[in-house]
Amino acid sequence: MESFSSKSLALQAEKKLLSKMAGRSVAHLFIDETSSEVLDELYRVSKEYTHSRPQAQRVIKDLIKVAVKVAVLHRSGCFGSSELALATRFREKLRQGAMTALSFGEVDFTFEAAVLADLLTECRDVLLELVERHLTPKSHSRIRHVFDHFSDPGLLTALYGPEFTQHLGKICDGLRKLLDEGKL
């Protein structure tokens, strides 16, 4: 007997449509103004660090696509109880990473690239486990691309170095606001 689900088909179409339109207009449906400002700063950091505009655009576009798809899955009630526990764990790890990044930015001589890299790697692994049966291998590779890019010790060291002080300040301001508002 053939299994058909209009809900599943609609969700699949929604994910496909959103993957084709990962621009600002769609992102604003799922990503607030403060998050958008943080993403813009992460783009600038990536562009300056890699000296490649296309590479920086690709990593932020991948990040937005993943965030939108996970939001669609969550809002559509696609996650079971064990997956909701993983989603909670992911959010806690992401929050811990944000608080650690803030602490490193506010307290001189405390930065350790390995600590942030490990937290981002843990976030990646939990997120991959969360979406394992919901997203395609292409989306899984996007997740790896984003987290591997931002957990690069060289990039993290540059971000906390003197040349990126202004970017780091804006990122920390955004993270602080997201934490204060309970959005992270």
From Swiss-Prot:
One of its GO terms (cellular component) is lysosome. InterPro entries: TNFAIP8-like, TNFAIP8_sf. May interact with CASP8; however, such result is unclear since could not reproduce the interaction with CASP8. Interacts with RAC1. One of its GO terms (biological process) is innate immune response. The lineage of its organism: Eukaryota, Metazoa, Chordata, Craniata, Vertebrata. The keyword Protease does not apply. It comes from Otolemur garnettii. This is Tumor necrosis factor alpha-induced protein 8-like protein 2. The gene is TNFAIP8L2. Acts as a negative regulator of innate and adaptive immunity by maintaining immune homeostasis. Plays a regulatory role in the Toll-like signaling pathway by determining the strength of LPS-induced signaling and gene expression. Inhibits TCR-mediated T-cell activation and negatively regulate T-cell function to prevent hyperresponsiveness. Also inhibits autolysosome formation via negatively modulating MTOR activation by interacting with RAC1 and promoting the disassociation of the RAC1-MTOR complex. It comes from the Eukaryota.
